[in-house]
Amino acid sequence: MFFRSEAEQAFNVDAIESPIMDTVIKKSAAVYSGEPPWKDVKNGIRTINFAKSLSSETARLATLAIKITIEGSARAEWLQQQTDAVFFSIRKWVEYGCAYGTVVIKPNGKTLDVFTPDEVLITDYDNQNITGMIFKDTYTQGKWYYTRLEYHRFAEEKQGEETVRPYYISNRAYRSKTPDSIGDPVALKDTKWSELMADSPPILKANGESLDGPMFGVFVTPQANNVDKSTPLGLPVYAEALEELKDLDIAYSRMTGEIHDSERIVLADDRLLSPAGTPVNKMTPGAAATTHLPKYVRNVYGDGTDTFYQEINPTLNTEVRVNGLNALLSQIGYKAGFSNGYFVFDQKTGMVTATQVESDDRRTIQYIKDVRDQLEKCMDAVYYALSVYADLYGESPAGEYEVTYDFGDITYNREEDRARWWGYVQAGKVPAWMYFVKFEGFSEEDAKAMVEEATPKEDELFDSKYKEE
């Protein structure tokens, strides 16, 4: 990371190095952005960027119908407002975490910032929990590139006979003419970060105790890091399947290349291509040049007594190649945490019941639950950091809060649910208006009015009976 030396010098600290993970991070960024090392346009090897699809699908399922509710006090209401402001970004944040293995979410006093591993330096961690970190933030103004380094850490200090661990935040700004260097130091007041302090005072709880954790949250993928077991960073969800992703790109490129080269070709003697009605003695070489030919016809100048004609119809091996693609997709999906056959190329599976889905995709369900657990852990830390900010800057009154996470069922089948609820209505277990609200889009008021209008009145029943008598 090009800002490592400047950061270490500015804050007089040694960042925890992991050359192996630095390589993984760089490769992950390239693969996720659609520029894997095996891409070779010259030799026809393209990429379908399935690493992006894996990360996106994992994030989609993990955040399916997510709902975060915070209750308990005025502080809870303020935290709910902060959540609602970034709610639709949560899925993207999870995707970045799946793609890079780690993503860090940090309050900035106004909203939440998100950092990938190539934008941070770890300075301290305890039992795989990161407690010290340097963040890199940038912006461009005119021809200048501005960079801010923000250092978060705990520090042990003596207060009389007691040892306390206050939390500190330090900021340093830089300016450069190129994006590949942070350049020279510049005063914070000369940047858009002018309201920030270079060094914060000690941050402690109101009772003088140390904070319960750092002022940021870290999302890591659930699988163990077998590349560097000592680092708290996670691995991309596709880390175990890089070789298969390479094979998939090669196989797909070969298949599409075969399709591109499969155009029907007709080789025909120029004497066969003369305009209709031309006398035989006038069928001279080059006469076909004045005739508009279909694009698949190639003119062959014959010099023999017989005219030449041949059709070339290449045979496609699509079915065989698709089977190979499906085998690779299944292996990639399994290594990423999904059930066998979750990813299939060009295949219709038809309708299945929720019970079948739960049985077939049990591995997927467990994997997504693990990802959701990591997301909850990260967001809990973020809410704690936000609450500390609220205390420091008086954003809201202090108070207890309780966070509830609700996720959608990935085995949910709407048609089955609809039939089940209609059965409840017919059995008299629930009122009909609830069914119309849940499945037909009615408002509660309109649904109740419609049901009431359709319900025969008791007086009308008696009147009808008397009229018949």
Residue spans for each PLM region:
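Extended hydrophobic-aromatic, low-complexity segments
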Residues: 17, 341-345, 415, 432-435, ...
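Generic structural marker for isolated residues within well-ordered, non-membrane alpha-helices
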Residues: 76, 329, 383, 432-433
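C-terminal amphipathic alpha-helical
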Residues: 86-100, 105, 255-263, 269, ...
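Extended, regular secondary-structure scaffolds
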Residues: 104-235
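Extended, charged amphipathic alpha-helical segments
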Residues: 196-356, 410
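Charged, long alpha-helical assembly modules
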Residues: 312, 316, 324, 331, ...
